[in-house]
């Protein structure tokens, strides 16, 4: 706890949503406004700083399922095959990978809360992995409840809702039917896990204002507490993979 004021409480925030929902834009806007307020903001990228066993994910998406690599754009659409591949064996693999990531989340959150940051922003969180699962399966629902109770819960979990058709036009990587199903999964999670703030599909500047107001509301109340019972983990993996390769 060296270097931290005893009365200091770090605000933990996460951003989630389907691909193309505008998370990067809103994260940048919130970070800039909070920094302008004189707050120390730290950004943690889930795929870079939290996710583990990234080589397995890259292999399954590209070599096994023959999906494209990289990040899609309107001028260069791609066809990814990773988190949109639904099967019994893949669900079992995801159960394992997501639990490993959950352990990593606990370690990363504990480290972040010991830093001098006033606000810690997660670019994606455990919720983005759980939204890849088939929630119609009772075993899957039990697993989701278990993992949701295992990871530290952000004080504010933003869900940027988006029209799948518009999202895919901005970031063409996955089939439209998957994006519709993925959106419904996110909304279902938001209704079951406390702490979500759903931002409806509205113009960027209006969404940014809603995001900022919610963060400032939480900061002004300061009714926050550090997640307890965090466990340790091994040192960070020095190998860095890009988000484009590991979204299993």
Question: Where do the model's predicted regions map?
Answer:
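Extreme N-terminal, non-catalytic leader segments
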Residues: 1-12
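Conserved lysine of the Walker
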Residues: 23
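ATP-dependent small-molecule kinase phosphotransfer cores
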Residues: 48-135, 142
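P-loop (Walker A) phosphate-binding loop of NTP-binding proteins
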Residues: 18
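NTP-dependent small-molecule kinase module
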Residues: 3, 169-248
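Hydrophobic anchor at the beta1->P-loop junction of P-loop NTPases
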Residues: 15
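A glycine- and Lys/Arg-enriched "phosphate-lid" helix/loop adjacent to the NTP-binding pocket
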Residues: 119, 124-188
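Hydrophobic positions on the alpha1 helix immediately C-terminal to the Walker A/P-loop
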Residues: 26
């Amino acid at each position: 706890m060296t270097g931290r004021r005893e009365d200091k409480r770090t605000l933990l925030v996460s951003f989630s949503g389907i691909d193309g929902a505008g998370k990067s834009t809103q994260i940048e806007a919130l970070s800039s406004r909070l920094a302008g307020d004189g707050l120390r903001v730290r950004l943690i990228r889930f795929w870079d700083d939290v996710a583990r066993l990234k080589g397995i994910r890259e292999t399954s998406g590209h070599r096994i399922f023959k999906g494209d690599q990289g990040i899609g754009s309107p001028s260069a659409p791609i066809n990814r095959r990773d988190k949109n591949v639904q099967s019994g064996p893949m669900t079992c693999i995801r159960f394992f990978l997501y639990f490993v990531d959950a352990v990593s989340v606990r370690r990363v959150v504990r480290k972040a809360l010991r830093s001098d940051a006033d606000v810690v922003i997660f670019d994606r969180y455990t919720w983005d992995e759980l939204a890849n699962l088939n929630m119609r399966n009772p075993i899957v629902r039990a697993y989701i409840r278990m993992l949701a109770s295992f990871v530290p819960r952000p004080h504010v979990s933003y869900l940027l809702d988006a029209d799948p058709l518009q999202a895919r036009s901005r970031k063409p990587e996955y089939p439209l039917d998957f994006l519709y199903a993925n959106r419904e999964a996110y909304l279902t999670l938001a209704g079951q896990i406390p702490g979500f703030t759903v931002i409806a599909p509205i113009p960027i500047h209006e969404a940014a204002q809603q995001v900022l107001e919610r963060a400032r509301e939480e900061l002004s109340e300061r009714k926050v507490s550090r997640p307890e019972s965090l466990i340790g983990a091994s040192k960070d993996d020095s190998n860095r993979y890009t988000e484009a390769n590991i979204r299993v």
